[in-house]
């Protein structure tokens, strides 16, 4: 079981490296790692388990965050009342198209690898299309908008050595871009 001690923190060199593409089929160890990443998210969202093991709640985890420089992410976004939830373990995900319109979270973004609160708006594409493989090597294509699009972009950034705060405008950190939508 992964815990917070398995998650590397800001400043660790792996978080700034471009992660390696995975060859398919995945090895047994790679599959186990991806399943453990998803399990961390499930546990982190369970109040009792999170309290018992000191887990910070998360909706996404990228392999570089557990010091594995490979292009794998797990995303688990619970239903917010809209009837939609997102539960994916993706291999070699790529954003293949995106909107011009930007979106941002009014409270900014957080990260399991960043212990401090970083003030500032993170502008991302409001709509994206992702192509990836699932854990068994099957093709997946996702069209995402709003909050899920933001979460997936955050995790894919980790695969490219990019941290969320890299997107914050240093001169005007709390100023929304023109035409950007608040999510």
From Swiss-Prot:
Pfam families: Pep_deformylase. Fe cation binds at residues 111, 154, 158. One of its GO terms (molecular function) is metal ion binding. Keywords: Hydrolase, Iron, Metal-binding, Protein biosynthesis. Gene3D superfamilies: Peptide deformylase. Binds 1 Fe(2+) ion. It catalyses: N-terminal N-formyl-L-methionyl-[peptide] + H2O = N-terminal L-methionyl-[peptide] + formate. The active site is at 155. GO terms for biological process: co-translational protein modification; translation. Its cofactor is Fe(2+). Its EC number is 3.5.1.88. InterPro entries: Peptide_deformylase (IPR023635), Peptide_deformylase_sf (IPR036821). Belongs to the polypeptide deformylase family. Removes the formyl group from the N-terminal Met of newly synthesized proteins. Requires at least a dipeptide for an efficient rate of reaction. N-terminal L-methionine is a prerequisite for activity but the enzyme has broad specificity at other positions. This is Peptide deformylase. The lineage of its organism: Bacteria, Bacillati, Bacillota, Bacilli, Bacillales. The gene is def.
């Amino acid at each position: 079981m992964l815990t917070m001690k398995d998650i590397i923190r800001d400043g660790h060199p792996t978080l700034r490296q471009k992660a390696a593409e995975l060859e398919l089929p995945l090895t047994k160890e790679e599959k186990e790692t991806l399943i453990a990443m998803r399990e961390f998210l499930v546990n982190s969202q369970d109040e009792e388990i999170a309290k018992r093991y000191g887990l910070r709640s998360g909706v996404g985890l990228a392999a570089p965050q557990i010091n594995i420089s490979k292009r794998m992410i797990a995303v688990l976004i619970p239903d917010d009342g809209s009837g939609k939830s997102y539960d994916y373990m993706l291999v070699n995900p790529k954003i293949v198209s995106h909107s011009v319109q930007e979106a941002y979270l009014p409270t900014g973004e957080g990260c399991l690898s960043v212990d401090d609160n970083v003030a500032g708006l993170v502008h991302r594409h409001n709509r994206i299309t992702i192509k990836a493989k699932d854990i068994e090597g099957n093709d997946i294509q996702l069209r995402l908008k709003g909050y899920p699009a933001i979460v997936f972009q955050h995790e894919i950034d980790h695969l490219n050595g990019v941290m969320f705060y890299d997107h914050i405008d240093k001169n005007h950190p709390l100023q929304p871009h023109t035409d950007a939508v608040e999510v």
